[in-house]
C-alpha cells in the first residue's frame, strides 16, 4: 500500500505485509493522495512542488516547483503523457514533454476575504480568539445562542486537531498536530491560506489571534518554535525557540499583554519513549542511560515526579519583533514546568505549575521533596513576582482560569501523597489565599469553565460538575460517558463532542446533537460571533452552524 504523510521523512511511503514500519520512497510531506503509474508515484507536496517518485525506492525523484510555493493538496491526474494538477495558488498546471509555457506571474490573492462575516455579532468583541476563549481562560461566553441549529458549511480537514476553533478577523484558524496552520472564511469555510513547517511532532497546541497577528506554538522533539504569522496571509513575521513538551493537554497558546507575547513551558530531554515509568505513557521504559533522564514526548497523566532537568520557564517576547524582553526560571523552587498554565486578569499575569505529588519518591531520587507546585502573580511588563504560594497549584492536565478577582485551578493528579482525592481550588487573586476547595472530583481536566452564571468542570470518563460560586460545593452533576472532551460554555449551554448542546439551566437536558462527524470525543465546539464552530479531532471535518432566527431563515445548501 502506498500513501502520503504530512510528516518529515514520510512524504511518499510504502507499507508492506510483515513490516511494522513504512518505507520512505521520496518527496516532501504531503496531504494529497498519490497517483500510481506503472513505475512511479505522482503527488503534490505541502511545499508547492509536484513529485514523481520511483515505486521501487531506487532512482532519482523528479520534481516541479509551482509559481508561488503554495501547497498542492488535491490528487494529480495523468493522461496521454501529461500531468494535470491544481494548486492552492488557484492555478491549474499541465506538464508535458514539450511544455514551454511560463509560470504565472499574477498572485490571485485567494487569501483575501470575499464573504465578510455577517450577523449582529460580527464585531471583534465577540471573537473566540484563543483556545479558552480569551486570555483569562474563562472558556465561556454568552451570545444568546439557541436552537434550532443548521449547518452553514462543512469542509474537509487533512490532519489531526486537538484544540478548539479559534476565530478573528472574519477567519477561523486551525493548527494540526503535524505542523499545518491554515485559515478559512468564517462565513463560508473557504480556504484562505495554508502553511506548513516540518519537524512538528504531535503538537496539540492552539493558535491565538491578536490584532491581525496569529501566534502558534509548534513543538517537536528536535526543535520547538513560537511562530508569529500575518493572520491575513499566513506570512511568517518572526519565530523564536522554546523548550519542553506540551504533551497531551497543554493546548494553550501564548497570552498577549499590550506589546508582549508571554508563554510558559518546561525543558529537558525527550524521545518517543522515556526511560522511567513516570516519564512514559504506555509500554516498557527504555533502558537507563547512566544518570540521563529522558521523558516521552507524550507522557503519562500520573505524575509523581519529573526529570531533574525539567525547569519551569516563562518567556516574554515583543509581539511586533519577537525580541526577548524577559525570561524567568523558577527551578530554584521546584522541578517540572510542562504541566503549567498562564492567564491574564486585571493587568496581572498568573502562573501555576506542578512538580509532582510524591514527596517521598522525589526525596529518594535526590530531588527537592517540597513543594509539589506553585502559583504566583507576576507583573507582565517586567516579569517581577508579586506574590507566590506553594500551598495551592495546578495538578497537571489543566490550565488556570481567572474571573472577577478569583483564580480557578484543577488537574489530573492528587495534590500530595496524603490523599487520592482531586479538588478544584478557588484562590483570591490579590494574594493567592484559598477561598474554597471543592468537594472531591475524579479529576478536573483541560480548564475550569467560569461563566457569569455557571462554574463547570469535567473529569475524564467521569462526571461533569457544576459548583456553587461561593462555597465550591457540587450543586449538580451529570455523566454522558464523555472521554477527555474539551467542552466550552456559551451560557446556558455546555458545548460538547459531535455538537452536543446541553442546557445547564434545565437539568442537563440535551437540546441538540449532531451531525456526529467525529469518531472521537476529544473536542467540543465553540461559539464565536454568534455562530457555532467545530473541529473533529480524528475524522477530518470542520463545520459551522447557524443558531436561532438566523438558522430559521437559512436554507441549507443541499436543499437550494
Descriptions of predicted regions:
Residues 1-8, 26-51, 55, 68-93, ...:
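Repeat-blade elements of multi-bladed beta-propeller folds
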Residues 1-5, 12-14, 21:
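Cationic, amphipathic, low-complexity alpha-helical segments enriched
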Residues 14-18, 54-58, 97-99, 185-188, ...:
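Short loop/turn segments that connect beta-strands within beta-propeller blades
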Residues 18, 140-159:
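A short helix->beta-strand "capping" segment at the edge of beta-propeller domains
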Residues 20-21, 61-63, 103, 152, ...:
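A structural motif specific to WD40 beta-propellers
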Residues 48, 59, 90, 179, ...:
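Glycine-centered loop/turn positions within well-structured domains
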Residues 98-146, 549-560:
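Sequence/structural signature of beta-propeller modules
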Residues 101-102, 301, 321-324, 370-372, ...:
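Kelch-like beta-propeller repeat domains
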Amino acid at each position: 500500500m502506498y500513501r502520503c504523510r504530512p510528516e518529515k521523512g514520510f512524504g511518499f511511503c510504502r507499507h508492506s505485509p510483515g513490516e511494522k514500519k513504512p518505507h520512505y520512497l521520496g518527496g516532501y510531506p504531503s496531504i494529497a493522495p498519490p497517483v500510481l503509474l506503472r513505475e512511479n508515484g505522482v503527488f503534490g507536496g505541502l511545499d508547492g512542488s509536484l513529485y514523481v517518485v520511483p515505486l521501487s525506492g531506487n532512482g532519482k525523484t523528479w520534481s516541479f516547483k509551482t509559481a508561488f510555493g503554495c501547497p498542492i493538496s488535491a490528487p494529480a491526474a495523468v493522461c496521454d503523457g501529461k500531468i494535470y494538477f491544481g494548486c492552492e495558488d488557484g492555478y491549474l498546471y499541465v506538464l508535458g514533454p514539450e511544455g514551454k509555457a511560463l509560470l504565472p506571474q499574477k498572485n490571485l490573492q485567494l487569501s483575501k476575504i470575499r464573504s465578510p462575516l455577517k450577523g449582529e455579532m460580527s464585531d471583534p468583541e465577540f471573537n473566540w480568539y484563543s483556545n479558552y476563549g480569551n486570555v483569562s481562560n474563562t472558556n465561556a461566553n454568552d451570545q444568546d445562542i439557541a436552537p434550532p441549529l443548521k449547518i452553514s458549511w462543512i469542509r474537509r480537514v487533512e490532519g489531526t486537531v486537538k484544540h478548539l476553533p479559534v476565530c478573528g478577523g472574519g477567519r477561523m484558524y486551525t493548527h494540526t498536530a503535524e505542523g499545518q496552520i491554515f485559515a478559512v472564511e468564517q462565513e463560508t469555510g473557504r480556504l484562505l491560506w495554508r502553511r506548513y513547517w516540518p519537524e512538528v511532532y504531535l503538537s496539540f497546541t492552539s493558535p491565538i489571534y491578536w490584532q491581525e497577528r496569529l501566534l502558534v506554538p509548534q513543538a517537536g522533539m528536535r526543535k520547538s518554535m513560537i511562530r508569529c504569522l500575518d493572520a491575513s496571509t499566513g506570512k511568517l513575521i518572526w519565530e523564536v525557540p522554546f523548550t519542553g513538551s506540551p504533551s497531551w493537554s497543554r493546548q494553550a497558546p501564548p497570552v498577549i499583554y499590550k506589546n508582549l507575547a508571554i508563554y510558559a513551558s518546561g525543558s529537558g530531554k525527550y524521545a518517543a519513549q522515556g526511560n522511567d515509568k513516570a516519564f512514559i505513557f504506555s509500554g516498557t521504559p527504555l533502558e537507563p542511560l547512566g544518570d540521563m533522564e529522558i521523558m516521552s514526548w507524550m507522557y503519562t497523566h500520573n505524575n509523581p515526579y519529573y526529570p531533574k532537568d525539567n525547569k519551569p520557564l516563562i518567556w516574554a517576547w515583543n509581539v511586533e519583533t519577537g525580541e526577548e524582553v524577559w525570561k524567568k526560571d523558577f527551578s530554584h523552587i521546584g522541578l517540572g514546568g510542562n504541566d503549567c498554565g498562564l492567564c491574564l486578569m486585571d493587568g496581572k499575569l498568573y502562573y501555576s505549575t506542578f512538580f509532582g505529588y510524591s514527596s517521598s519518591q522525589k526525596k529518594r531520587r535526590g530531588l527537592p521533596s517540597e513543594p509539589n507546585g506553585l502559583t504566583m502573580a507576576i507583573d507582565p511588563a517586567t516579569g517581577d513576582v508579586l506574590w507566590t504560594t506553594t500551598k495551592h497549584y495546578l495538578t497537571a492536565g489543566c490550565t488556570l482560569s481567572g474571573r472577577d478577582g478569583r483564580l480557578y485551578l484543577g488537574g489530573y493528579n492528587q495534590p500530595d501523597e496524603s490523599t487520592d482525592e482531586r479538588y478544584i481550588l478557588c484562590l483570591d487573586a490579590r494574594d493567592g489565599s484559598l477561598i474554597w476547595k471543592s468537594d472531591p472530583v475524579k479529576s478536573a481536566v483541560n480548564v475550569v469553565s467560569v461563566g457569569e452564571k455557571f462554574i463547570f468542570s469535567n473529569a475524564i470518563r467521569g462526571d461533569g460538575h457544576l459548583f456553587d460560586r461561593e462555597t465550591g460545593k457540587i450543586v449538580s452533576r451529570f455523566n454522558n460517558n464523555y472521554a477527555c472532551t474539551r467542552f466550552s460554555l456559551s451560557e446556558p449551554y455546555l458545548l460538547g463532542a459531535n455538537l452536543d448542546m446541553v442546557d445547564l439551566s434545565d437539568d442537563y437536558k440535551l437540546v441538540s446533537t449532531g451531525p456526529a462527524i467525529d469518531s472521537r470525543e476529544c473536542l467540543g465546539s465553540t461559539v464565536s460571533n454568534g455562530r457555532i464552530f467545530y473541529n473533529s479531532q480524528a475524522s477530518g471535518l470542520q463545520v459551522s452552524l447557524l443558531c436561532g432566527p438566523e438558522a430559521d431563515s437559512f436554507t441549507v445548501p443541499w436543499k437550494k
